[in-house]
Amino acid sequence: MQGAKKPSRRRFILGGLAVTGALVVGWGVTPPRQRLNGSHHLPLSGDGVALNGWVGINKDGTISVAMPRSEMGQGVYTALPMLVAEEMDVPLSAVRVVQAPIDKIFGNIAMLKDGLPFHPDDTGRLKSTVSWVVGKVARELGLIITGGSSSVKDAWEPMREAGATARAMLVAAAAAEWKARAEDCRTENGHVIHADGRQLAYGALAEKAVTAAPGEVRLKSPQEFKLIGHPQPRRDTPSKVNGTAIFGIDARPPGMLYAAVRMSPVIGGKVGSVNSAAVLKMPGVMKVVDYAGVLPEKTGAGAGVAVIAKSFWQARQAALAMEIKWNDGPLAGLSSAAIYADFAAKLDKEEGYAYYKAGDMDAVESKAAGVAKSLKAEYRAPFLAHAAMEPVNCTAQVKDGKVFLWAPTQSPGFAVEVAAKVAGVPAENVVLTVTMLGGGFGRRLDVDMVAQVVAIAKLADGYPVQLIWTREDDTTHDVYRPASLARFSATLDAKGNVLGYDNKSASGAISHQFMQRNLGLPPGGPDKTTAEGEFDMQYHFANQRISHVIVDSAVPLGYWRSVGHSHNAFFKESFIDELAHAAGKDSVAFRRELLAQHPRHLAVLDAAVAKAGAAPDGRAHGVALHQSFGTIVAQVAEVSVEGTEIRVHRVVCAIDCGLAVNPNTIAQQAESGVVFGLSAALFGAVTIKDGKVEQSNFHDYPVVRLNQAPEVETIILPSAAHPEGMGEPAVPPIAPAVANAVFKLTGKRLRSLPLTL
């Protein structure tokens, strides 16, 4: 390794595991845990019986499917049941979802393995060994998490196997009833059908199937799919339209009270003193609590004072009226300018962790003066808030040694653990109901709001309490997408060929903070998210180095939709355009040259460019190509500039996500990702001054409005490859695509987000 620290073998392995939250130290490498049957019963109602840990069946033939992932608009309540319905040969309408119990069989193995810091082209023994170990550890940890665009990817095998096994058990039960061979039976539309025409409905076979020994369990081939790969309507849409869908904020346990909080305006500040005498006389106010005394350390929950009242309005008005003196603490002078200055200083002094290298960059740089052209650029990205439509909320009741919890969470396991920790009860005494989420985007991976509401409910005399943060609370007390500073340098020969490519960036590390807040583990090791999308890109240069410097962050950091890809794609795809311009080449042709060994990437790029066609007069097309979460996305943004206003009219989005389980939700996620990413590209910025977040609501943290949203055209390329992620991959390319179009129109290279002229 030249020009950057070479990681030791041990550090590399442990660092890779650290970013996934799975630390191998102390774990034995045990045989793979069977994912078909767990240690907890599938929660079924009425006459339902469980055929395995994932699938149950009622006498009326309805199928119950365990749902270990949270529905937050990405369509898992449709896509995951499709996997079971396909293998069981039942219509999707016959399947209902039930909340999966906290059990290791539902752990998200794919997300943890995807967090390892290896290049996609790496076929070495270290990668295969570490991936194998992580798979073992992940099975034992059983972390039930919705994130990393991994829901379908992780469920692809276990849920299909659960469905196929259930079908085989039903066939065995029917064969026994008829005293026939299972080989002479087939299944169709919820029935087992014998070759002679006899048939039995699944419901009639349910009880006997429980004890039936399945014969051969065979998964369908793609050629046999009737549901998978065919567009299916979202099953959660009707309830969201008619208002019957239950989100966290809709929880209404009997006798529920409401809580509003005041938290320190300065990051890390504490409560000094509170004068609540007048507040206690206000209408509906039941209690004022400083919950810090019952809140354990390292839960991520912000210190503050809560008002418990009969309505949220009463609680909020009383909270605003409280006289609180704050102890601001050591961060009262913190500013965005100081944070970026610290990044720059660290980049000047430290070599950083080298994620990828090829050739000899030191030799290239030493000869840079003799080459045709040398290029340097510095890019930056700000902190970002999540701004989910449903504000942060959670409902809890602490009574008789138990905790009842209603939570719109992406991390059910963490929610149960922190609730038990705060309440001082065993985890098995926590009863969790996971509601729908009005947007997650990574914010609800953290469980600080769970810790906060349980602490408040512990002081509420047994009443259930619903905690609601206002938009201002949410914006000023988020766990933010890290700010980042990246430096690029490259050398080109007289023919425009890139001789060397170097990228060195600096930012905080999400995993270090997340591990402390949610696992109680000390920070350490590399964090793949800091360099993802850059070190693992598919552009190849003979001499290349990608490194990152972790700078400890006082600002709370959290996972944000597409995580490090959200800024690294902007940096990388913008600089690739700079290289194309410096080489005197068309930006698309330049990319094609670099992707000569990657036909799937080329196909995606070509599909987007062909569909986009020529830009109309007065507009320009900007192009970006990026792979994240296993999915390749190319976007062409059609942009105009009027004065200082950047307007995006149309976006063509081409996708290769492997086998498209439900093309309908894939297209929806592409549209959603474009708009989400465009909001960040044009408007998103959280700034710090005097230790405080300056933004508070949509007036100063705007998102794309309906009249600003572009037309989005989605192309899904056919593929038989393993399904990959789709919840996030459409987010990263939009910012560089727009920036590259602006350069064509104005000749001005925009290297900072949000994009401004």
Describe each region flagged by the PLM.
Residues Q2-L757:
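Cofactor-binding beta-sheet edge motifs in enzyme active sites
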